[in-house]
């Protein structure tokens, strides 16, 4: 089984900054649910998708059948991501791909054998799929 883990807060932060805004992770953002919906489109058999967000669980959050979402509460989402990568790699021998622009998080996850895709490459790949109407981006394929 393959697991794709997204640093959701990092991805959203970069989108907000590209629009000249600063996100507030203490409050719900429409971009959170949009990211989950987008990822559920690319789910393939044998691939698990997890998205991690900083901050408290959202009271209006709806569970998605294809994408598992985690909120860090008072902890850092980065630490939860690293713990998950370590567990999946060491205990289950799973292939893990991390999507983040955070260099320190990338390095921490690589120590457990995770593949890394930068947020910039993630968006570029997604836009190419949308533009050329391909079925799924390379990072989602087994």
Where are these predicted regions, by residue range?
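Nuclease catalytic cores that cleave nucleic-acid phosphodiester bonds
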Residues: 2-4, 10-142
């Amino acid at each position: 089984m393959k697991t794709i883990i997204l640093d959701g807060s990092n991805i959203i932060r970069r989108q907000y900054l590209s629009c000249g805004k600063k996100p507030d992770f203490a409050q719900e953002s429409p971009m959170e649910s949009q990211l989950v919906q987008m990822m559920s489109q690319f789910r393939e058999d044998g691939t698990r998708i997890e998205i991690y967000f900083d901050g408290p669980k959202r009271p209006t959050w709806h569970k998605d059948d294809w994408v598992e979402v985690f909120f860090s509460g008072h902890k850092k989402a980065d630490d939860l991501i690293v713990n998950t990568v370590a567990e999946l790699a060491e205990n289950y021998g799973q292939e893990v791909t991390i999507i983040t622009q955070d260099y320190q998080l990338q390095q921490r996850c690589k120590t457990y054998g995770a593949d890394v895709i930068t947020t910039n490459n993630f968006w570029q790949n997604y836009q190419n799929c949308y533009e050329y109407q391909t079925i799924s981006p390379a990072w989602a394929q087994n």
